[in-house]
């Protein structure tokens, strides 16, 4: 019955304190350190009372609901409960007690809180149920055609829905093998893992695939076992998609669209979709879900017209944790999740994302969608990645700026 609160390992002390306090976390499980972060030192600074109080009976001034910290290190500092001791406590719980607790759970209860980007203020805790994430992981796996013979390499973070739901739960619900190539993304290790493990599927965001495609040693690895995977998490450049299919043998690679608040996937291309659809759209609405495109007044727009994308169904979160106002702003009374993304839908139901509503550039009264310009830049063979933004301009209101990353050897 415990609710898992996913925490970004890159958080600094202030961000960690906010999430722990806002969610009301009672227990925290932590590694001792990772990369440049010393988590033990960070927690000792946030909770100086740790060293002087009994484990499990913590009373912290800054984090009043926190009762203890569990460390994955074998010999953590005083006040931290070692993981090895925690697992030993299971012997004090009877099978009858376990079954009683299991029987008390309901599929619609919260099981996971994932904090979304704080670009519009403090991060909000998207609260997801068993029903949300188990079904979404299953549906993603169904679209990929996963089975017990598949071996999925998961280099994406497990604290995000991409790794946790689309990766872990997608595999668990289909009997597929989960493979983690490294503790943090490394393009060389990921390619080596695919080759050594004869992986059939691979996940990644576009920048990950770009890094793997540009890895100088890529030709040394046999990637012919790959057949499918997902590129998601950000706009998927057309040229990158073509290279993944042609150079990494991922003939059935799919695009998935969604957000943390929708568990996460709402739309996905299918294995039978032709290349044109997979590189120009994010697919069609998943089974058991609904999508619509609306104008600023909330009215449906004609097919092919750009408006805000909204989705509804089993995948929509329970709400933002302890944030009823934020929940009401995101989910309307009819249950539609307002994504904030601009999109259009064709006659066959395929959706094309034009960009974020707030990212649209208005230059001299003209609406300009960064995605369209980015796709044009990607047609140049020297361009590895590009981001288009608008900046204030006294003459036109906004002016267009493009940040471009070149492939090695180009300028």
Predicted regions mapped to residue ranges:
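Conserved structural elements of the adenylate-forming
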Residues: 93-96, 107, 112, 126-147, ...
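Structural core segment of the AMP-binding/adenylate-forming
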Residues: 2-85, 408
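Conserved helix-loop-beta element of the AMP-binding
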Residues: 24-27, 48-70, 151-153, 179, ...
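AMP-binding/adenylate-forming catalytic core of the ANL superfamily
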Residues: 11-21, 28-32, 202, 297, ...
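Conserved AMP-binding/adenylation subdomain of ANL enzymes
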Residues: 134-151, 161-201, 215
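ATP-dependent adenylate-forming carboxylate-activation enzymes
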Residues: 2-21, 32-38, 176-197, 208, ...
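Gly/Ser/Thr-rich phosphate-binding loop
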Residues: 87-88, 176, 196-204, 213-277, ...
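Conserved pre-ATP/AMP-binding loop-to-beta segment of ANL
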Residues: 62-66, 70-71, 76-77, 81-115, ...
């Amino acid at each position: 019955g415990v609710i898992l609160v996913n925490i970004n390992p890159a958080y600094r002390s202030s961000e960690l304190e906010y999430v722990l306090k806002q969610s009301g976390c009672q227990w925290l499980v932590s590694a001792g350190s990772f990369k440049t972060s010393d988590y033990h030192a960070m927690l000792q600074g946030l909770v100086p009372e740790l060293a002087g109080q009994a484990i499990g009976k913590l009373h912290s001034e800054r984090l009043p609901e926190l009762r203890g910290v569990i460390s994955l290190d074998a010999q953590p500092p005083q006040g931290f409960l070692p993981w090895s001791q925690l697992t030993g406590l299971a012997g004090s719980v009877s099978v009858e007690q376990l079954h009683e607790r299991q029987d008390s759970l309901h599929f619609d209860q919260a099981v996971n809180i994932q904090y979304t980007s704080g670009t519009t203020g403090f991060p909000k805790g998207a609260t997801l149920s068993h029903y949300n994430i188990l079904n979404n992981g299953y549906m993603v796996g169904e679209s990929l055609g996963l089975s017990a013979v598949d071996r999925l390499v998961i280099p994406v973070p497990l604290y995000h829905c991409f790794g946790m739901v689309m990766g872990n739960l997608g595999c668990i619900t289909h009997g597929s093998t989960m493979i983690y190539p490294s503790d943090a993304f490394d393009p060389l290790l990921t390619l080596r893992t695919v080759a050594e493990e004869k992986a059939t599927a691979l996940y990644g965001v576009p920048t990950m695939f770009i890094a793997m495609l540009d890895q100088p040693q890529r030709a040394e690895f046999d990637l012919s076992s790959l057949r499918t995977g997902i590129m998601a998490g950000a706009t998927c450049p057309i040229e990158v998609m073509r290279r993944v299919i042609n150079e990494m043998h991922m003939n059935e690679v799919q695009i998935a669209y969604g957000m943390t608040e929708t568990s996460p996937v709402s739309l996905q291309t299918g294995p039978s979709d032709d290349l044109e659809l997979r590189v120009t759209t994010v697919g069609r609405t998943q089974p058991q879900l609904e999508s619509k495109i609306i104008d600023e007044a909330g009215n449906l727009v004609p097919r092919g017209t750009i408006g805000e994308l909204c989705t509804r169904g089993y995948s929509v979160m329970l709400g933002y944790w302890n944030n009823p106002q934020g929940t009401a702003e995101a989910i309307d009374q009819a249950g539609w999740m307002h994504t904030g993304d601009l999109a259009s839908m064709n006659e066959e139901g395929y959706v094309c994302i034009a960009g974020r509503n707030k990212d649209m550039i208005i230059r001299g009264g003209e609406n300009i969608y960064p995605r369209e310009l980015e796709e044009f830049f990607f047609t140049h063979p020297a361009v590895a990645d590009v981001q288009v933004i608008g900046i204030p301009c006294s003459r036109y209101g906004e002016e267009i700026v493009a940040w471009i990353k070149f492939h090695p050897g180009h300028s």
